[in-house]
Amino acid sequence: MSRKLFRNGRIFTPTDRGVPLAGKHQGDVIHIPRGAIYAKDGVIEAVGDEREVLAGISAGQVDEEIDCRGYCVIPGFVDPHTHMCFAKTREEEFLLRIEGMEYLEILGRGGGILSSVRAARAATEDELFAFTRKHVMTALGLGTTTLEIKSGYGLDTESELRMLRVIERIGRETPLDVVPTFLGAHAIPEEHVAHPDGYVDLVVHEMLPAVARHSGAVFCDVFCEAGVFSVAQSRRVLEAARGVGLELKIHTDEVHDLGGSALAAELRATSAEHLLRTSETNLRAMAEAGVVGILLPATAYSLRRRYAPARRMVELGLPVAVATDCNPGTAYTESMPFVYGLAVLGMGLSMQEALVAATLNGAYAIGQGGRVGSLEVGKSADFLLLDGKSPAILAYHIGVSPVVEVYKQANPMRQWEGITGDHP
């Protein structure tokens, strides 16, 4: 048994109401100026004002005491949308984009996702694991303690299953909690471009049953966008996914308001992601259906597009989460501190709203709200020490990470091989 007491921290944490926080509750964050956390075997047993926590335990109940030195203490980041499982970067496409070429044009030339597909298919499982682990450990050093990772660079049954095996191995062999998502409907592979409905048939009739039998995938996602998968095709995939026991996610309204957000509301998907072009009608529909909107400001920043209307989403009662969208093409970042800063400075969220978006709502967006995302009794002792007076330091101190230490299940993470971060 391991019993640890963390003292002298400025605690900021969302308050979990059992559902994603939305509307006037999006910024429900409590501040404990001198707080303490008592954890037993990695689970929080007490949290609150230091004097009150100390009054509830005896010296014999503490194996180790850690002084948080007045640092800001927040929950570990939950990154609910990543594509960290890939085999090579795409710097050459970045140069094309900054010269003005649109992403869908790059995709039409066989670049974009299709470039990553060729690389992933050619990579061995160990090569793919090593590349993925590098990015996951970078994320850990920057404060992410739970994350989702999608497949989607295989686009055939064997390659998609290989990616999911790698993602599951990442969850076993790194300290992070990893939620696998099947994204076989990420793009139409080159061999099916003349018959896209035939590829949808493959996803529905071959891939999804195989994923359900042979992988630990929790979610199924689909890229519902002009030139990729139509609303009708996306519906086929998502309904089939639900039929084999997977929860639902959808990439939609990144470039065009195609109607994927309305589909998300109709199917009561767990989340809808991107949402740069979503109509107010569909935002309201998703809010009523309890869909979490996962916003990806680093992608908008990288593509030099307008940000998703986060402020309006909060006003309409849509639960907002934020994520890195870490991928080799349009958002090559593992940094949730950077994303938090963009949420505040680019999308207009308050310090408290952005903290909820980067922690508790992200947890609910991947089915982990009961375990992580806030510092409360019964949850995993996953938290960060920040060199600042409040979480605002994440947006205020531009371009660096203020993360001093990362704790996962009350264990310090800095000793892990491969972990990186800006702070000494």
Swiss-Prot record:
The residues that the entry says bind Zn(2+) are: 81, 83, 251, 325
SUPFAM superfamilies per record: Composite domain of metallo-dependent hydrolases (SSF51338), Metallo-dependent hydrolases (SSF51556)
Its recorded reaction(s) are: 4-imidazolone-5-propanoate + H2O = N-formimidoyl-L-glutamate
Tell me which domain of life the UniProt entry assigns to the organism this sequence originates from: Bacteria
Residues bound to 4-imidazolone-5-propanoate are: 90, 153, 186, 254, 330
- Identify the EC number(s): 3.5.2.7
Question: Secretion signal: which residues?
Answer: none
Q: How is the cofactor bound?
A: Binds 1 zinc or iron ion per subunit.
Keywords in alphabetical order, please: Cytoplasm, Histidine metabolism, Hydrolase, Iron, Metal-binding, Zinc
Which Gene Ontology BP terms does the record give? Answer: L-histidine catabolic process to glutamate and formamide; L-histidine catabolic process to glutamate and formate
Q: Name one Pfam family in it.
A: Amidohydro_1
Q: Which PANTHER family match?
A: IMIDAZOLONEPROPIONASE (PTHR42752), IMIDAZOLONEPROPIONASE-RELATED (PTHR42752:SF1)
Q: Which NCBIfam families match?
A: hutI (TIGR01224)
Record-given protein name: Imidazolonepropionase
Q: Please report the organism this UniProt entry assigns to the protein.
A: Syntrophobacter fumaroxidans (strain DSM 10017 / MPOB)
